[in-house]
């Protein structure tokens, strides 16, 4: 497989992505984290903005979480950003600011698993390490005819063995990028372009017309749905009250809106924690799909004069100026609700 892939990569592979122009371990690492569950076209502007602010691991290690989350806002999966900051701090503390030398040391950093660690070392240092991201799992499952869901331990072990066997002993960085590109651009999840595939001659899935069956999908489960009422407290000066979320869990460490289980609880919260509150009104619901559940957000807009003394902790509660926004991490749905509040205040 490797010779055909490398020949294809020379003419059809992606070679001018921002992190490829200067593939240092730090730049490749940041790109690999951003690319998890996210398309390349979406990542490029985020990566470039991130590099302008944090050109190296030391500048990232000294950053405040709010600024990192601000630059990540809109990418989703915010645990990636928190782990990236923690890992940068670990690189400086444990390795003197130099990216670790071994696969095991890289895997010991927060948020970096085996495949990501292997990709960083392969792409930045041309070291021989097999990778197994989602694209590679799909390519190998189809080419070798591997049955079963790739997330099952036995299937994953089989795929790791195949990934190791296919990885060549030279031109590692090119091969690694080539097999990822093949999965992303040719051997896609739906409607793979088999006629354009450089390794289609030996593909079990193509020979048996099994492209739609391989790899096997995740076993279906009932998708949970959650609902919450979010208090959108507005005061003069185009200010909206934000609450910092707990460090872990949904949108961990980011700034959100006070959340209540029911409208009655939200109205009670307004009476207890806002001063001079006007009668609240319910806004248009906002729905957001996470990877593992659907979230229905029901905003309760309320005008007030200020917040109660119980909310004086500025590290947890702050007034956010819609016209001059602070550089803090706002999840996209929260930013949408804050923007709605700004429009409502503009109409006054």
Where are these regions (language model features)?
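Intrinsically disordered, low-complexity, charged terminal extensions of DNA damage-control enzymes
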Residues: 1-16, 20-21, 184-348
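Catalytic cores of DNA base-excision repair glycosylases
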Residues: 3-212, 225, 274, 336
